[in-house]
């Protein structure tokens, strides 16, 4: 019941995905051969959300892995959990996308997309009641961004009523891997606004800060960053996989978090974040969790929620705790910081409680917020985009693959519209609405 199909694309997506499956296997007591070696029936009760049971009692992840070059996939395959995936579900090309969105979306990626869709279709047909898809990718490169968005739009055509959730790694403000990141990211956002239902916005710099400041790691690796992401990913779906007192699923999440269809870019956070050494020395309380998960330093993307307002938010608690306490704490946050919530959406914080905590913790919580301050991310990418596009820098790489400059202009204006929409709702107040109504009534009287 309620299966989720996981898709990972490009180098970044595959590395996050590999880490994610380590976390999920750990939670469900699956070892690296796919055999169950856990100690609780609860681990098996809804294991079919993420796993297919194959012959001989092996559990195979419902995962599709794609890339345009074989390198990252080989390292996933030879990694600790590489043998657990279905070999047919590795779909890869040889040529690579070379950080070029057009190659991923129009040329190289388009040649490979049908074989990816076949695998997706095969996995979807294996599902009893498919709830939706979760896609891991980055927006700065070529494959994850170009081919990732192509796949999302194709899946959208074929499964229009299923949820589409993405974990998208945005280019960081100060750290840049490639010079054309702003192009790739803008073209991708243009697609994600239209075709995805929910986007969890991540970025490396914010993750580095968390590792460095909060976790006290001297030299964080991508592995550490990906571990943070996968903790959040696991938290988002824990209610589907374990029994809870207050359930949520992808669709409930969307209904509670998205007031206007285009504004579906969320900030995510996770608590407790404590350095590996100090974990066993403290007992966590619900107030501590709540305080940490609402903390701006805890957000996994480089936007500061204090610069905007929350349209909506959702908190998923895991562990044995009283729902009364959870409700009190959430109410407390809203009352104390009421200026950071828009007043024209009452009760805009949803909470859910799942009884089973992640391994090694007594309780944990995942935070998802729809804040207008996310526009900082888009604004920053847009500025970098404009700076290059004004000079038509690097454009020949894209036009050479058959793209038109018009497409860039469209993507740019779509992104600017998005920023403007967030700004509009940030400034909106409850009185605006009433004034409008007042005017209309007067007009009617005059008429």
Curated annotation (Swiss-Prot):
Signal peptide range: none
Keyword GTP-binding: yes
Record bears the keyword Cell cycle: no
Binding-site positions, Mg(2+): 69
UniProtKB keywords: Cytoplasm, Cytoskeleton, GTP-binding, Magnesium, Metal-binding, Microtubule, Nucleotide-binding
Superkingdom of this protein's organism: Eukaryota
Cofactor(s) in the UniProt record: Mg(2+)
UniProt binding sites for GTP: 11, 69, 138, 142-144, 204, 226
Localization terms from the record: Cytoplasm, Cytoskeleton
Tissue: Expressed in roots, leaf sheaths, and suspension cultured cells.
GO BP terms, alphabetized: microtubule cytoskeleton organization; mitotic cell cycle
Compositionally biased spans, kind Acidic residues: 429-447
Expression induction: By gibberellin and brassinolide. Down-regulated by abscisic acid (ABA).
GO cellular component: cytoplasm; microtubule
PANTHER family: TUBULIN
Subunit structure: Dimer of alpha and beta chains. A typical microtubule is a hollow water-filled tube with an outer diameter of 25 nm and an inner diameter of 15 nM. Alpha-beta heterodimers associate head-to-tail to form protofilaments running lengthwise along the microtubule wall with the beta-tubulin subunit facing the microtubule plus end conferring a structural polarity. Microtubules usually have 13 protofilaments but different protofilament numbers can be found in some organisms and specialized cells.
Family, as annotated: Belongs to the tubulin family.
Purpose: Tubulin is the major constituent of microtubules, a cylinder consisting of laterally associated linear protofilaments composed of alpha- and beta-tubulin heterodimers. Microtubules grow by the addition of GTP-tubulin dimers to the microtubule end, where a stabilizing cap forms. Below the cap, tubulin dimers are in GDP-bound state, owing to GTPase activity of alpha-tubulin.
Protein name: Tubulin beta-5 chain
């Amino acid at each position: 019941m309620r299966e989720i199909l996981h898709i990972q694309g490009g180098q970044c997506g595959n590395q996050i995905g590999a880490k994610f499956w380590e976390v999920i296997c750990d939670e469900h007591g699956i070892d690296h051969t796919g055999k169950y070696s856990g100690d609780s029936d609860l681990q098996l009760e809804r294991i079919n959300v993420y796993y297919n049971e194959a012959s001989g009692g092996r559990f195979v992840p419902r995962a599709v892995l794609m890339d345009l070059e074989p390198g990252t996939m080989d390292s996933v395959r030879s990694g600790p959990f590489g043998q657990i995936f279905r070999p047919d579900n590795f779909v890869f090309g040889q040529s690579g996308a070379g950080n070029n969105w057009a190659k991923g979306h129009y040329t190289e990626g388009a040649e490979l997309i049908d074989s990816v869709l076949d695998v997706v279709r095969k996995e979807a047909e294996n599902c009893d009641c498919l709830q939706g898809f979760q896609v891991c990718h980055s927006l700065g490169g070529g494959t994850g961004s170009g081919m990732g968005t192509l796949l999302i739009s194709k899946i959208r055509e074929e499964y229009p009523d299923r949820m589409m959730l993405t974990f998208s790694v945005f280019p960081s403000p100060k750290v840049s891997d490639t010079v054309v990141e702003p192009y790739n990211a803008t073209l991708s956002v243009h697609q994600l606004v239209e075709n995805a239902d929910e986007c969890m916005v991540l970025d490396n710099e914010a993750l580095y800060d968390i590792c460095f400041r909060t976790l006290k790691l001297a030299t964080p690796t991508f592995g550490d960053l990906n571990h943070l992401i996968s903790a959040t990913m696991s938290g988002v779906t824990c209610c589907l996989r374990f029994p809870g007192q207050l359930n949520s699923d992808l669709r409930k999440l969307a209904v509670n978090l998205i007031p206007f269809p285009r504004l579906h870019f969320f900030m995510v956070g996770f608590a407790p974040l404590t350095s590996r050494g100090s974990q066993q020395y403290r007992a966590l309380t619900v107030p501590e969790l709540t305080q940490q998960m609402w903390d701006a330093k805890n957000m996994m993307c480089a936007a500061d929620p204090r610069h905007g307002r929350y349209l909506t938010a959702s908190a998923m608690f895991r562990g044995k705790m009283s729902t009364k306490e959870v409700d009190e704490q959430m109410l407390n946050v809203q009352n104390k910081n009421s200026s950071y919530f828009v007043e024209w959406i009452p009760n805009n914080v949803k909470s859910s409680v799942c009884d089973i905590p992640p391994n090694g913790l007594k309780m944990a919580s995942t935070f998802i917020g729809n804040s207008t301050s996310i526009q900082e991310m888009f604004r920053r990418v847009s500025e970098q985009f404009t700076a290059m596009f004004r000079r038509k820098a690097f454009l020949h790489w894209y036009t050479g693959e058959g793209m038109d400059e018009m497409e860039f202009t469209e993507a740019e204006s779509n992104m600017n519209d998005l920023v403007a929409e967030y700004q509009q709702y940030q400034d909106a107040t409850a009185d605006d609405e009433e004034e409008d109504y007042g005017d209309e009534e007067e007009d009617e009287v005059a008429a």
